[in-house]
């Protein structure tokens, strides 16, 4: 989704019966490394920013006009608890997820006179390949992130997406923070 042209071509190649998208889930997101802001790799940050912010903007721009024209639709952006407060070694990632919140809020304002809904789901610790990418393939470091806790799974987040999409059309869940029971904030976690 980082390549706008490819994304547009993929949407154009959908069968006719799938082109009228009712629910857009902007779920692309990653982070590479744990570098300090003044020591980070600018090329890696370009990838993070392109994936976490620009792809969300591109998909929204490509899909939402059709929703507006049809008078129905739901945009669900997957943000992160990291968008609420920065943490050591994650300033750029945290900034991109804060941008997801701002973009979600702004889109909701832009669409206030339509029946479209906008939701920002902000997961806490979810065990996916996210940490493997963050630690540049170091599986041991990635596994340590989840050591001593029961993290959420991708299926758990899918349940929250389903819930947000299933509420009656006269209501919208603007924002949902979802985390494991033993997580209090982005950085405060109780481990066994």
Give the predicted meaning of each segment.
Residues 87-91:
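Active-site loop immediately N-terminal to the catalytic Tyr-X3-Lys motif
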Residues 60, 96:
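Active-site helix of classical SDR
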Residues 65, 109-112:
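Alpha-helical segment proximal to the catalytic Tyr-Lys
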């Amino acid at each position: 989704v980082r390549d706008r042209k490819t994304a547009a071509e993929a949407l154009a190649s959908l069968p006719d019966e799938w082109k009228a998208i009712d629910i857009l889930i902007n779920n692309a997101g990653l982070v590479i490394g744990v570098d300090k802001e003044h020591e980070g790799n600018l090329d890696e940050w370009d990838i993070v920013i392109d994936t976490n912010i620009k792809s969300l903007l591109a998909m929204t721009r490509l899909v939402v006009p059709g929703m507006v024209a049809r008078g129905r639709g739901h945009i669900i952006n997957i943000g992160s608890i990291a968008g609420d407060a920065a943490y050591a070694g994650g300033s750029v990632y945290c900034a991109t997820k804060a941008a997801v919140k701002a973009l979600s809020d702004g889109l909701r304002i832009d669409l206030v006179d339509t029946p479209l809904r906008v939701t920002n789901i902000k997961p806490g610790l979810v065990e996916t390949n996210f940490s493997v990418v963050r630690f540049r393939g170091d599986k041991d470091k990635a596994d340590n992130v989840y050591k001593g806790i029961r993290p959420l799974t991708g299926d758990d987040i899918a349940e929250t997406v389903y819930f947000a999409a299933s509420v009656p059309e006269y209501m919208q869940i603007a924002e949902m923070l979802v985390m494991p029971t033993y997580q209090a904030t982005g950085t405060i976690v109780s481990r066994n």
